[in-house]
Amino acid sequence: MRIAFVTTCLEPGKDGVGDYTRDLAAACKSQGCDSRLIALNDRYVGTPGEEIQAARGAAIEALRLPAASPWHDRVLAARSFLQRRPEDWLSLQFVCYGFHPKGITVGLGQHLAPLIGDRRLHLMLHELWIGVRRGASLRERVLGALQRRAVCSLIGQLKPAAIHTSNAAYARLLGNVGIQARLLPLCGSIPVVADAKSGWLEQQLRELGAARSADAPRSEQWRFGFFGTLPGEWSPEPLFTYIAAAAERARRTVSVLSIGRIGPGEQLWREMLARYGQRFSFARLGERSPAEVSSFLQAIDFGIATTPWQLIGKSASAAAMLDHGLPVIVPRDDVDIGADGLETPDPLLQRMTSVLPQWLPQARRGLPRDSLAALAARFTADIRSAGMTDIAR
């Protein structure tokens, strides 16, 4: 099966959906598919160009098209790239903000229709629309309504043969507007490194004042970690109060660590440091290599997810934590669409409730796992099934 994966940006390490798409293409290639990549709206290139991108031990042909170029020129270049070796499927990895700064993709279907032509289209909806969380502002709800209309219009115009989304809450939102989507939860973007060395981490923690005291065993310290973006609306309460209570009873010190780009959470991090700095130690490690992130996830005790419980299936950061066998706390529960975020609850995921102080001392790591291979197998099985249904029609 020949698949061209279409996304907005393929700058390694700068675009989460692009990184996911590259990994999925590589995994499909390792399972016998012919995979290629197209970035249709890439802000990191100034001119169109082809290159070979490496991921998970595979080399993949990629075409990157600059966001500044006219749509007509980008579509012509992408069509020429595809015509050299016709694909069985185009897989559009859609996130509305990749195409427009406010996520309003009105008219996108008209641009993409000539590219798709008579090829079978798969659509992965990584994001839908905003305004569904409790307490959403009027501005969020209005913008979300525009985004919803644009997504529905896109699907109506392009008529994909197969649609996936990452969590049951999104599937329910789509079902409410008459769109049926299968679930394809995300995998982690960080490969598990066997025998990872954590010497660099211990040195950094000493320099940043977050290491345990020299005479204290590691078992007397709990390390909680954020990975990636910290949304400005994320609240440390009541999580940090629960952690403090559990740590006092268990006679543990607590370190709160962050790795990766923190994004819009700069001010929130400073506020947490000022408010809780007497009770917990804090350390920001910044952007690191995948191998260092893997060693970090293997060296801490608990992950903290910043995605709401019902949307947890769309979080690549949470998926990376779970892939590393890390118990993950999910404090946010401000989205209520009437569906859990995963088809099957993961025993390593802990929804934050008042029992958290009792759960923390009992939590244990799981075994590392390779969710990418299973994801690729499920993806290809689903589109093969959709393709057979399409032929039968």
Which residues does each PLM region occupy?
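Nucleotide-sugar donor phosphate/pyrophosphate-binding loop at the beta->alpha transition
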Residues: 122, 130-154, 169, 190, ...
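Acidic donor-binding loop of glycosyltransferase active sites
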Residues: 297-312
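Membrane-proximal helix-turn-helix segments that form the acceptor-binding/catalytic region
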Residues: 110-117, 141-162
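Nucleotide-activated donor-binding/catalytic signature segment of Leloir-type glycosyltransferases, i.e.
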Residues: 258-260, 267-291
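A short, active-site helix/loop in glycosyltransferases that binds the activated sugar's phosphate group
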Residues: 132, 152-183, 188-195, 267
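N-terminal strand-loop element at the rim of the active site
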Residues: 7-12, 26-84, 170, 261-266
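A short, glycine/small-residue-rich beta-strand->loop->alpha-helix junction that serves as a flexible
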Residues: 7-22, 45, 98-103, 232-236, ...
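Conserved donor-binding/catalytic core segment of Leloir-type glycosyltransferases
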Residues: 205-235, 257
